[in-house]
Amino acid sequence: MEATTKKMAMIEIGKGWAASCLEARTCVISNEEDIYAEPRADTPVLKLDSTVRTALPPGYGIVISGTARNHKTAWEIVPGLVDSGYTGLLGLLLVPTDETPATGSAGGGIVSFSRGGVHARLTVIKLVPDDIMGACGAGAQRLPLKTAITSFKGDEDLLGNGFDHCMESLASIYPDILHVQLDCPVYFGCTGCKAFYRRLGSCLETRPLNELGSDHIYLRRGSAYESVNRFAAPDDVMFVAMYGKWLLIGMAETPNEKLTVELRDDDSSPAALIPFHDTFGQKEAEDAGYDIRAPENCTLPPGGSVRVILRQKLHMGKGRAAFVMGRSSMNLKGVLVEPERVVDDEWVSFNITNIRDAAAFFRKNDRIAQLVALEDKLELMGGVDALPWRVVQSVQEEKKNSSRGDKGFGSSGV
């Protein structure tokens, strides 16, 4: 149990390591003795074990970054994410910066680092609460949809055989939608929709909530058309989007009763085209990141890179930022994700690079990256730590009730 009710980041510093700048809340750990690591033949990534442990209250995490140098090579510490409940020894993953990464193995023999050769920044971050991320479409505005039992050709409100009038709009919703004319009800591209509903933006009326009717679409006073990207609805509503003059709604099934889609005009909350947890996995209270799964099978040749695009957009709002980071288990194998900030209202995307000599393969739904959402901070690494530090004798004694414990070596999902 913590000795104080004030939220603090705890750190236990073992033999051969030191921590500096704790009072300034810019914690850096470094080696006070010569340290050694044994390279692996199948990856150029070097795993370096420290004797440092940390623990945080739920709702916080640590981003590890930094550099290292020995008499032969300059190294970069692969950015890693530490869960609040992890109490094991922190591990550092290093990649050489002055060599061509695709050369493959780190070579034979033991790699040594002299005293002071390793500097790792431990940046404490505050996380966006899970209930905000998970309910990123809930709101006060309502969009009544007409009852639509069948598909109507050329109807102004329901896109049936006449959906070609909105082909340009529909094609803009996701990069790989098929540019062909289909009859509803059928599945259209990757949206998983059988029915589409549309209304001209010029037909949208602005009224107070207490004057909402059942035959029109309303926008709350002061809201903008862009707010339709923030919505909550029954599961069969796959997306709500504004493109040009059209408001577009895609449904997995043709509705047999009146539906209600709630729209949000509060840009301080995240927004999504589909439910957040349909793309990002559920996480435990002590987890820092949300799992990102591969949308399809992929093989990366040695030195190869691929841009992964998810069928998801976010709007984090003021004072918040979301980043895609790699998973330590993949980083260790030499399959790296360069940390990248998610751009509001654009498709969530990121690069994966294989720096090994051998090809890398991942299957659809494999966990390949993670999303971390920051509160009151727009930069992933550096800056002032979100919590003050407290040096303790034993992190594991202070954090006895942690469900994560010492599983893994410090980064989420190992």
UniProtKB/Swiss-Prot annotation:
Natural source organism: Psittacid herpesvirus 1 (isolate Amazon parrot/-/97-0001/1997) (PsHV-1)
Record-listed substrate binding positions: 327-329, 409-410
Cofactor: Mg(2+)
Gene that this sequence comes from: DUT
Assigned protein family: Belongs to the dUTPase family.
Domain of life of the source: Viruses
Function: Involved in nucleotide metabolism: produces dUMP, the immediate precursor of thymidine nucleotides and decreases the intracellular concentration of dUTP to avoid uracil incorporation into viral DNA.
EC number: 3.6.1.23
Name this polypeptide is given: Deoxyuridine 5'-triphosphate nucleotidohydrolase
BP GO annotations: dUTP metabolic process
Entry-linked InterPro entries: dUTPase-like (IPR029054), dUTPase-like_sf (IPR036157), dUTPase_trimeric (IPR033704), HSV_DUT (IPR034745)
The keyword Hydrolase is assigned to this record: yes
Catalytic activity entry: dUTP + H2O = dUMP + diphosphate + H(+)
SUPFAM superfamilies named among the record's database cross-references: dUTPase-like
